[in-house]
Amino acid sequence: MAEIQHLAICTKNNRRLARFYQLIFGLEESWNRFQNSPYAFYMSDGYINLNCLQIRPGSSYNRMVDGQEIMPDAGINHIGFTVKSVKDIEQRLSSLNPPVKLVASPQDGRYEEWRITDPDGTIFEIAEGGWEAGGPERLPAIRYVGIRSEDPERLASFYKSALPIREVNRVTDPTGEARAIFLSAGKTALGLLKKTSASKNGFERVGFQVGSIDEIKKRLHNAPPYLYPGEPEVSVMTAPSADPGKTLYLKDPDGNIVELSEEGWIA
């Protein structure tokens, strides 16, 4: 089984974003003693390693287009899977049509070893060594990541072929077309959600299993400051009935969707 153990959110203020997740969800800093970088701010729930990654010129996640460096937008940028055998993943990728090649990650002390691009152009990473996540495991904990796609079926087929993961649930419309396909990736579910007119392809949301949603509401109200003057208040909201996700969610200070659930996700 390939396990999601890493999530990176690109941001223009990594300290502020890390502060929010520490104050509201109790994530703790996870120190990477091998990577001397002010741009990667690693947080942990005891199982998942969350990188609040500073957007900057020269990042390996930037793209060159017509000679211009394009930096990523603020938002969820990529996930990382811990795998038992990179060689097995390489064989899986080579058997795809067309074949997909592993791309080596920069060797500067970061945890990931290889990068892969899915059919929608979304990056994910793999590593045999995994990501440092501290411990012990606890709640609140990241237990879900959601990706929007024009074709969830195609994307599900790719991930199930490229990685040792399996489908555990799906939501369909009256015609039988998939609105959401959920894959098991260790203790964390990967959701492939049908793109809507109001959304765009790529990573869209993260989900926290929490002991008490009321406690999260109290923390949002009583926590020390994590917003700047004039920024909108963060509050727990109810999702539209057509949304295939959980009923309750919030948006972090950067606008990322964070689903909330006491029962968790099937994984």
Residue ranges and their predicted role:
Residues 1-2, 8-57, 108, 146-190:
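Core segments of cupin and vicinal oxygen chelate
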Residues 1-18, 76-79, 129-156, 168, ...:
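N-terminal beta-strand motif that seeds the catalytic metal site of vicinal oxygen chelate
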Residues 51-53, 115, 125, 191-193, ...:
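Conserved beta-strand in the GNAT
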